[in-house]
Amino acid sequence: TKGIDAAIQIVGVDTAEGRRDEALRLGLADAAYAAIGEAVAAEHPDAALVCTAPLAHAAVIGELLDNDLPVFTELNLVSDGYRENMAKAAAKKLPLFLSSTMLYRRETQYIKQQVAEFGKPVHYIYHIGQYLPDWHPWENYKNFFVGNARTGGVREIFGTDLPCLLDAFGDVESVTVQKDTL
């Protein structure tokens, strides 16, 4: 927790006592609480990072904004609460930033630069797929967000990649899909 700046304190919130204990034991957090309100009252944080199950994002972001905290959130896989939370952040003049890390990576910027320098239309074939038991072997994929029809189905990868693809190549003109099951 101190790799960037020794003065930074990281406080975790998780309803699962075992996860809170593990975060403290591994030195991933300086303190851990069962509820956002409890953490805010005790620690008075400067900002919040949302790194939780996608279907919980809207409520968590809303509660953090209600506590007057700037929010950085990992990719949200559903649009639940987007408009409300954006309006709340704007009304409170609080930053609400959705992760777009891939847009800033060097390799992504390199691809964008090469496409621009080429100066002609380009053809790009995008292939994505994953075998969930291999991707996340430490727990059954049916027990976390990729096992849910609203938040699974490679959304977490495609949702991260799509802004980069659009930034480098422009608007999509056509789509072809091939699907198979093993």
Model-inferred region functions:
Residues 1-26:
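N-terminal Rossmann-like dinucleotide-binding module
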Residues 10, 30, 46:
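Conserved acidic residues
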Residues 41-45, 117-118:
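Glycine-rich phosphate-binding loop signature in dinucleotide/nucleotide-binding domains
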Residues 30-43:
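Short acidic low-complexity segments
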Residues 22-30, 85-90:
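Short, conserved SAM-binding/catalytic segment
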Residues 102-178:
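Predominantly a Rossmann-like dinucleotide-binding segment in NAD(P)-dependent oxidoreductases
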Residues 47, 53-54, 58-103:
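Beta-strand-loop-alpha-helix segment that lines the small-molecule cofactor/substrate pocket
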Residues 46-47, 123:
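Short, Asp-centered acidic motifs that coordinate Mg2+ and/or phosphate
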